[in-house]
């Protein structure tokens, strides 16, 4: 072939040279492992063998072989060929001539430009061909066998306490989100939520929640606002997936999913020994010398590695794949950075769990890859992998905003030209235009920035935030712990003033409302040293920013309740819930207008049964709702007299005509009794303040010289002007702490009500005895000797009370044992009364209140009746439970009381205070005052109707008496505490 002919076919010669180089390399490296997805094409006897990635043009190959045979000795190698149709050759030739490029194979083409040497370029990214997942259900479970090859540990073991350290976890702003389990009814159109609290689930900080901690890959810690059922504590609770260890054909042990896994589900934590860079290199050489084939090093952060070679858990058996179904992610748990394996897609039960080692896993020498995926790179680990492959995770690539994230990993891994260590990723990112930051991408950027240890990645991420001008995006950055994350980045790169200026510019653009987030992040203490760092631009920017922040106000936030971690979770019972509802109904004022009742679910429509109507003859359909027509104006009430309705007001006005305007309010009640009660309470409080020493203030005050105050002496001697009853009350208050000291020791031996009554009795007895024998010199204080006597007397008194109580309980038990054989006697006592007390049996209904809900006055009068005749020694008769009778036909509701404020105090505290000894005696007086008066007599009958039927008078009169009785029974429960 002439030289001129070779010159005319220069473009073909370049393509053939590259093709021959690939063929020669594949033939010479016969000992190299067969690459998955590509090496199979080099087998001549394989039906699937296709020389398409290697030779694209048969004529070019033949031309090149002829030129080589004329200049060199003939080679015994037989070139691989591929048959093409003439139409395909013509189309490819035309395409190459038009574009100036020639396709070589594997997506690589030769680009020809005038005056420039030929360049190799990748025309398109190699997409992974989807294929059905391979299942390994037939392999046996080898978990126990595999666990014998290493030491199983639960958590990472750190070489020192500073290893794996990261910024402290931030508090979560989420609240509890309880979701009830829905039970399907027989009808598909009706759903009833479960009323059992045990069937509800707390979905707080779950996958579908807007939890800031979960979005930024931070686990909630300890006292979380979500409660003990927080869904964002997977590492701490070791919520591992159900997996098993299997023994593969070429890859050794592997992990198999025993159940279906959803995307992003936590599978296992990668644990081991956390070491720094020095021990990492030593162990690599040591394991290589020991003949350990598999390596288990994972990069935790810059200069820190997790070694699971000899210590770890089942996560170490997760193999490598170039097309993985799992990924490795790093989470902040407390003050440590931890690594976990997560599902990247939906994984079927029986699939092998694999992830890409090129991101964080390292080994001494390159090893052949047996993943069998179409996009397999051929090797795992070693220097070649470290130089050629990208070391960035998919999350970091997405956070950087690179458009072609799918093709980047393959393009960098297959790059023919070598790059310097650590520079190829940065150069590639610089060559790609990142996307603009939107509101949905803030989460990925802040999560990557939280764990970023590389300066160039931090600069790229900060640049995306800095270039954004959308106010909603900035608000989202602040919400995603923006101040805390930027504070950590500022402390990390404070020596680089360019990065510091970048962060300060972002902080200056943040919305400024309150100082709360600024104070919580403690970023001011980090910026303060920058005001004198030496760089004029940084100093000016930091000073202005601190001045702007100092003008902001601190917004008040309700502090979060601190939970006791040792406290048991309260269990809710449906019976307690019913009692609480009845309590609420009793406390709630009754409305005069009827409210619409809740309609129960109706059955199938009548048309579905051919118009026959309901099968049940008792089912008459829903009752029609009748709302009360035109209620009375405020302040007016209705009553009946001889079958006629008249209207009256609280002031005493009566009329037969229905009023249309609100009634004038009555004059306020006399204040004498109220003022007297208030004054007694005020005096008791003032006396208690005089006797209680003031606590030391937390804020130190300037000491002032003490001056003699004559008023202090007069105030101390003021008790001499009190009456004897008032002095006794003061002395009783003085004895109260010492009596209570003894009472507390007997609170588990005696009933609560008896204990209170005994304490009051012993206090009365001590006060009367000391005043009778003139042992009281100052009722506001007692000496140590008197204190010991009081405690000794109280102890003897309560010892006797306990002995009598135990004897009474013993007799009661013996009596019940004797009468146990006769059930009829227990069911119907002789005379219709119970054995324990003389009160008749009363039937209780579900809506009746218990003893604890009765009024204060009723309980106190009952207590006085039980304690009559024995005030110095404990009573042997047990207190019976107070019950209300339920009438068969309840009377109509009464008119409201004259004083509406009295009804609000029905449920006041029932506790007996030692500073109010005469509360029981005063209760009856107040109850008598609070009894409502019956309605005023009706006005004169109208002129048009002077006759009133006599038959209706008796009936209406009976109903009218029912109003008074009902109102009196309601008002009788008001005690002195409620009126005050």
From Swiss-Prot:
UniProt xrefs under Pfam families: AWS, Med26, SET, SRI
Major site of localization recorded for this protein: nucleus
Annotated ranges, domain SET: 241-358
Domain Post-SET: 365-381
EC number(s) given by UniProt: 2.1.1.359
Bias kind Basic and acidic residues: ranges: 80-97, 576-587, 710-724, 772-787, 811-822
Pro residues bias: start-end ranges: 661-670, 932-943
Amino acid composition bias (Low complexity), ranges on this chain: 61-78, 870-882
Annotated AWS domain residues: 167-239
SUPFAM superfamilies tied to this protein: SET domain, WW domain
Annotated GO MF terms: histone H3K36 methyltransferase activity; histone H3K36 trimethyltransferase activity
A GO cellular-component term linked to this record: chromatin
Keywords recorded for this protein, A-Z: Chromosome, Methyltransferase, Nucleus, Repressor, S-adenosyl-L-methionine, Transcription, Transcription regulation, Transferase
Basic residues biased stretches: 616-626
Gene3D superfamilies noted in UniProt: 2.20.70.10, SET domain (2.170.270.10), Set2, Rpb1 interacting domain (1.10.1740.100)
Subcellular location: Nucleus; Chromosome
Alphabetical list of InterPro entries matching this protein: AWS_dom (IPR006560), Post-SET_dom (IPR003616), Set2_fungi (IPR025788), SET2_Histone-Lys_MeTrsfase (IPR050777), SET_dom (IPR001214), SET_dom_sf (IPR046341), SETD2/Set2_SET (IPR044437), SRI (IPR013257)
Region entry Disordered, spans: 21-133, 562-636, 652-675, 689-724, 767-787, 803-980
UniProt-listed GO biological process terms: methylation; regulation of DNA-templated transcription
Reaction catalyzed: L-lysyl(36)-[histone H3] + 3 S-adenosyl-L-methionine = N(6),N(6),N(6)-trimethyl-L-lysyl(36)-[histone H3] + 3 S-adenosyl-L-homocysteine + 3 H(+)
Function summary: Histone methyltransferase that trimethylates histone H3 'Lys-36' forming H3K36me3. Involved in transcription elongation as well as in transcription repression.
Comment text on domains: The AWS and SET domains are necessary for transcription repression.
Family statement drawn from the similarity comment of this UniProt entry: Belongs to the class V-like SAM-binding methyltransferase superfamily. Histone-lysine methyltransferase family. SET2 subfamily.
UniProt-recorded name of the protein: Histone-lysine N-methyltransferase, H3 lysine-36 specific
Organism of derivation: Emericella nidulans (strain FGSC A4 / ATCC 38163 / CBS 112.46 / NRRL 194 / M139) (Aspergillus nidulans)
